[in-house]
Amino acid sequence: AGAPNVMMGHSHSGNLSAREGVARGVITMLCSDYYPAALIDAVFILHRECAMSLSEAFALVTANPAKAVGIYSEVGTLTVGKRADILLVREIGCTPDARITTPVITRAFVGGNSVYRSHYPDQPHGYDR
């Protein structure tokens, strides 16, 4: 199912709600062909609004897709012997009480090597959570 569907809370074409499908256990992975950032946003929305653990929600965009395409032995979980592709994510509150938050990628590692470092946490706007 599409991660943007999770963000919107419904399908833009009137099809199955991804949130409902995940909650019922009929959707086991998320994708996005036009808004890749939706993958991280959807994980946090499912955790916050659908009472999924972060590990369950992240499996929808990591382990489960890796299994589906036959590369689970190489990627998809942090396991000895697998490639270490890691994102460090920080939730930034958009309101003082942090009721509305957005996930921000602060570091990215590919194959265990640092490939991205954000300076966003040093910026004075937003409310850290």
Q: What does each model-identified segment do?
A:
Residues A1-V89:
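His/Asp/Glu-enriched, well-ordered alpha-helical/loop segment
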Residues K67, V80-R129:
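C-terminal cap of metal-dependent C-N hydrolases
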